[in-house]
Amino acid sequence: PPGRALYGDEIELTGWIRGLGKARLQIAHGSDWRVLAHLRARSDGRFSVRVPALASTRYRLAYNGFAGPEVGLSVVPRVDVQADGTTLKVRVTPSLPARVDRLTAKQWRPVAAGTGTFERELGPGSYRVAVGGDSRYASAVSRPVGLR
C-alpha cells in the first residue's frame, strides 16, 4: 500500500490481478468511485500504475461489479523553509495556510502566519513552519531553521 507521499511526488500502485482479465483501478471521488485506469496484467499477473500524489484519497480494484479493499493515501504538503539573515522564506506547496513558530523556553510558540509563498522579517532564534491537516492533506512541520 502507498500509505504516505509528499505533494507532487509520483507513487507506484502495484498489485496482482491474475485471472481477472481487464480490471479497473478506481479512485474515490467524494462518496463515489471513478475509473482511474484500465489495468492489464503482465504474464505473472502483476500490474503497476504510476499516479501523482495531489491530494489524500483512496484507491481500489474493481472487476465486473465487484470491488476489492480500499487502500488509502495521505498526501503531505511540501514545506520548504530558508533562513536569509533576519528573513524567513517559506514555500508551502500546494498553497495552504501555514503558521510560523519560534522556539521559546523549550516550547514552540506561534509568531506569524502566511499562505503559500511568503517572507517574514523576524528576530534571532529557531523557527519552524507548521501546516494543519484536513481531509485533503496531512499535517506537516518543517525542520527547524535559525535566524541570526
Enumerate the predicted regions with their spans:
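Low-complexity, Ser/Thr/Pro-rich intrinsically disordered linker/stalk segments at domain junctions
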Residues: 1-148
